[in-house]
Regions:
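Charged interaction scaffolds used for protein-protein
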Residues: 1-12, 32-64, 76-128
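Short, surface-exposed, low-complexity cationic segments
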Residues: 19-39
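Short capping micro-motif at the N-terminus of alpha-helices
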Residues: 15-17
Length: 128
């Protein structure tokens, strides 16, 4: 389990990445977390490369997926203080910037994947 705190609209919000998060996300939103993270990261990267703002807006579906992922990870980190409804959680913020929050979430997942890979390599050595 990995945790990271991010300041959002003047409030510190903790996010948690663990093996349970993809399952929680799938159960709550009926979507694949990793596929959605890749799609969102691609949209943000694409927008950053384009100069024409009109043709480079991030699709609303991607923004919604991002909010859903952030919500699941925040609720997983702090179930006592994160409301059971995503709309109630989002209402707490005046702004919720994908450019501020997404890098922290991606970093958590990259760190989580590295930890799993190292554990798998160590298991292979022990079993081998």
């Amino acid at each position: 389990m990995l945790r990271k705190k991010v300041e959002i609209d003047g409030r510190e919000v903790e996010f948690k990445a663990s093996a349970a998060v993809p399952r929680i996300y799938r159960m709550k939103f009926r979507r694949d977390l990793f596929m959605d993270l890749q799609k969102i990261a691609k949209s943000v990267k694409k927008k950053g490369k384009k100069e024409d703002k009109e043709s480079s807006e991030i699709p609303i579906e991607d923004l919604e997926m991002f909010e859903n992922i952030a919500y699941v990870m925040a609720q997983h980190a702090d179930p006592e203080n994160v409301p059971p409804d995503i709309m109630d959680w989002l209402e707490q913020f005046n702004t919720f910037s994908i450019y501020q929050i997404l890098p922290a979430i991606l970093e958590l997942w990259n760190m989580n994947e590295e930890t799993k890979s190292q554990a798998k390599k160590n298991l292979d050595r022990v079993a081998g």
